[in-house]
Amino acid sequence: MNGTYNTCGSSDLTWPPAIKLGFYAYLGVLLVLGLLLNSLALWVFCCRMQQWTETRIYMTNLAVADLCLLCTLPFVLHSLRDTSDTPLCQLSQGIYLTNRYMSISLVTAIAVDRYVAVRHPLRARGLRSPRQAAAVCAVLWVLVIGSLVARWLLGIQEGGFCFRSTRHNFNSMAFPLLGFYLPLAVVVFCSLKVVTALAQRPPTDVGQAEATRKAARMVWANLLVFVVCFLPLHVGLTVRLAVGWNACALLETIRRALYITSKLSDANCCLDAICYYYMAKEFQEASALAVAPSAKAHKSQDSLCVTLA
C-alpha cells in the first residue's frame, strides 16, 4: 500500500455555480473577518498588554499561524477557477498546511498549560514560565515545518486546496492523521481533567464561583471549536484511507466531503480570535484562584481585567 498511488478521481473537482459562489462568499468573509480579528489580537498582545505570560505567548503564536493561513485564502479562491499544480500553488499549499497543523499543535500546548495551571497549581510555578512557553512554540514550529518540508522533499503530496487526488497514498495520509488524533486525545484529556478540577473546587464566595463557572464554560467552548473545526476533515481522511484506492465512485464523494470539511476547518482562524480575550482572562483568573486566598485572588482578577481592557 505504501508505494501505490490512487488511480481514481484524476480529474479536478467541479462544482455547480451556486455552490462555487457559496465558497467564494464563505472564504471571503473568513478572510476579511479573520484578518481584522487576528490583526487586532496581535496588536493587543504586542502593544497593549504589559507582561509576557505563558498564555500570551501561546496565543500570539496562534494568531501568527492563523494570519499566515488566512493569507493563503486568496489562492484557495483562485483554485476554484484554476487547479493547476504550479510552484506557487504548492508553496501556498505548504503554508496552508503548516499553519493548520501549527494551530492544532498550539491549541494542544494551551490545553496542557491550562491543565498544569489548574490541576497542579503548586508544581506549575516550576513547570510554567514565559521562557519555557517560547521554547515550546519554537520547537512546535520546527517540528511542523520540518515534517512538511521532509514530505515535500520525498515527493509525497497531499491534496490540500489544490485538490487533485491522483497521488494520494498511505504515506500522505499518515502525517495529517497523526498530527490530529494525538493532539485530539491530549486536548480531550486535559479539558476533562480541568473541568473536573473546577467542578470539585469548593467556592468560597460568589465571585470565585462565577469565575470558576466562566472558566469551565471556556474549556467546553475551546474543545467544541477544536472538534467541530478539525474532526470532520480528519474523519474524512480516515474513511478515505479505510475504503482503499480503487473504489472510484465512493472516492469521488469522499473528495467532495474532504474539500468541504477542509474549508470548515478554516473557520478556526476566526473562532480562535474570538476566544483570545476570554482565554487570557478566565484562565489566568482560575490559576490565581487555585493558589491564592480569596481576597488576594479578587485583587489579581481586578488587576488582570484592567490590563486586558
UniProtKB/Swiss-Prot annotation:
The chain crosses the membrane at residues 25-45, 57-77, 91-112, 136-156, 175-195, 219-239, 259-279. Belongs to the G-protein coupled receptor 1 family. Changing S300A: About 50% loss of ARRB2 recruitment. This is G-protein coupled receptor 35. Disulfide bonds join C89-C162. It is a multi-pass membrane protein. The modification Phosphothreonine is found at T307. InterPro entries: GPCR_Rhodpsn (IPR000276), GPCR_Rhodpsn_7TM (IPR017452), GPR35_7tmA (IPR044734). It is found in: Cell membrane. GO terms for molecular function: C-X-C chemokine receptor activity; G protein-coupled receptor activity. GO terms for cellular component: plasma membrane. Keywords: Cell membrane, Disulfide bond, G-protein coupled receptor, Glycoprotein, Membrane, Phosphoprotein, Receptor, Transducer, Transmembrane, Transmembrane helix. Interacts with GNA13. Interacts with ARRB2. The modification Phosphoserine is found at S287, S294, S300, S303. Changing T307A: About 75% loss of ARRB2 recruitment. The gene is GPR35. Glycans are attached at N2. G-protein coupled receptor that binds to several ligands including the tryptophan metabolite kynurenic acid (KYNA), lysophosphatidic acid (LPA) or 5-hydroxyindoleacetic acid (5-HIAA) with high affinity, leading to rapid and transient activation of numerous intracellular signaling pathways. Plays a role in neutrophil recruitment to sites of inflammation and bacterial clearance through the major serotonin metabolite 5-HIAA that acts as a physiological ligand. Stimulates lipid metabolism, thermogenic, and anti-inflammatory gene expression in adipose tissue once activated by kynurenic acid. Predominantly expressed in immune and gastrointestinal tissues. Residues 46-56, 113-135, 196-218, 280-309 are cytoplasmic. Residues 1-24, 78-90, 157-174, 240-258 are extracellular. SUPFAM superfamilies: Family A G protein-coupled receptor-like.
